[in-house]
């Protein structure tokens, strides 16, 4: 399992997922991850670095979306291997789930019911974090959980 997820629980220390909203620069991303990691170690906080390689949900077509998956994968690898920090990012398509090298895969709220995307995320064997869509009631998320379980997810 993933180190970050093993540290979660009511009887465990505080956990945070933090990082820049969008991937803008490799050096900046590593600097942010390093600084957050040091601060979390100082205060004994469980930490996972989050960064979006593509903000596909921008309101305007002119909005900055990120540097893309290929460059982001290099940064995620560096942060995990050099800093020892777990990583997480959103995926928007099944093929992205299949190749992304983060420790954890996150499904964005607006895509939380997409069956093929959920299946692809589960098939990676990684922890999957699904954000609740604003259009769903809390009890409707049971259907999302049922989909995950139907693909063999048991975390």
Give the predicted meaning of each segment:
Residues 59, 102, 107-155:
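Conserved anion-binding
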Residues 13-17, 54-56, 97-99, 124-125, ...:
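A short alpha-helix capping/helix-coil boundary motif
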Residues 37-41, 76-81, 122, 145-149:
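Surface-exposed amphipathic alpha-helices with a cationic face
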Residues 16-19, 47-51, 87-89, 105-107, ...:
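Hydrophobic faces of well-ordered beta-strands that scaffold small-molecule active sites
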Residues 1-75:
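Conserved N-terminal beta1-alpha1 strand-loop-helix module at the mouth
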Residues 51-106, 112-118:
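N-terminal active-site wall of soluble small-molecule enzyme domains
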């Amino acid at each position: 399992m993933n180190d970050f997820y093993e540290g979660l629980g009511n009887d465990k220390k505080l956990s945070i997922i933090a990082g820049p909203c969008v991937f803008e620069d490799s050096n900046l991303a590593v600097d942010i991850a390093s600084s957050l990691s040091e601060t979390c170690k100082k205060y004994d906080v469980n930490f996972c670095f989050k960064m979006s390689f593509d903000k596909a949900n921008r309101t305007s077509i002119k909005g900055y979306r990120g540097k893309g998956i290929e460059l982001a994968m290099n940064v995620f690898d560096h942060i995990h291997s050099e800093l020892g920090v777990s990583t997480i990012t959103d995926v928007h398509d099944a093929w992205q789930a299949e190749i992304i090298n983060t420790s954890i895969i996150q499904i964005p709220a607006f895509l939380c019911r997409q069956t093929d995307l959920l299946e692809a995320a589960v098939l990676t064997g990684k922890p999957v974090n699904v954000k609740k869509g604003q259009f769903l009631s809390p009890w409707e998320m049971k259907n999302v959980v049922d989909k995950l379980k139907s693909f063999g997810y048991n975390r």
